[in-house]
Regions:
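Extended, solvent-exposed regions of the mature portions of secreted/cell-surface glycoproteins
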Residues: 1-208
Length: 208
């Protein structure tokens, strides 16, 4: 206890022992890219504590997708879209110090897309697909050579076995149909498409 005034003199004191805290994490060893993994945890569950999926070898203050233990046990976390080696970690909220960790393998996922090689401009393209079919995933009809974050007309793969119907652009040319993951727009399947021009003719009497 410090008194006010010059020098803040100590008027009273008592010993204090600070004990360390611990945590543990239990989860599957692997998860598909973009999937959800359930993590059972033990730990202090203090305000701001969080459990994260981080790149292998990342420092304590570097973290990826995360959730708060207070949200539940087990805690559901979304895996990254990029396959590779990661680590699950329990961080203290105030210092980000890691109390517990365990390795996690994020496996690659793929998709297939089937449709006619040509389509008429302005028409509708029915795309049969296989893939994760997660909420927010989408199938797009894009300009050939477009970046993953650039997409054109699209549809959601709503139900397995039901083709996704996408409106074909009005401009003929070379395009690509792509399956994008929801969170990163990462492409896990693609196939080329040629959009062909359509013509029309009119016949009528010369005068009425």
């Amino acid at each position: 206890y410090h008194a006010g005034g010059s020098g803040y003199p100590v008027l009273a004191k008592a010993p204090l022992s600070v004990t360390d805290v611990a945590a543990s994490l239990e989860a599957a060893a692997s998860v598909p890219a973009g999937g959800t993994i359930e993590v059972k945890w033990t730990g202090p569950n203090d305000q701001g504590d969080f459990v994260s999926i981080d790149p292998a070898g990342a420092p304590d203050r570097t973290y990826g997708n995360y959730g708060y233990p207070a949200k539940g046990n087990p805690l559901a976390l979304k895996a990254p879209d990029a396959a590779g080696d990661y680590v699950l970690r329990y961080h203290l909220g105030d210092s980000y110090r890691v109390l517990a960790s365990r390795p996690l393998r994020v496996g690659a996922v793929g998709a297939t897309l089937e449709f006619p090689a040509q389509a008429n401009a302005g028409g509708t393209l029915a795309v049969r697909w296989t893939g994760p079919g997660r909420e927010g995933d989408f199938i797009s009809l894009d300009a050939a050579g477009a970046g993953e974050q650039t997409y054109g007309n699209y549809a959601y793969p709503e139900a397995a076995g039901r083709p996704a119907e996408i409106r074909v652009p009005d401009e003929p040319g070379d395009y690509v149909v792509r399956y994008h993951l929801a969170s990163s727009y990462g492409v896990i399947g693609s196939a080329p498409l040629t959009v062909e021009a359509v013509t029309a003719s009119l016949t009528a009497p010369a005068q009425v």
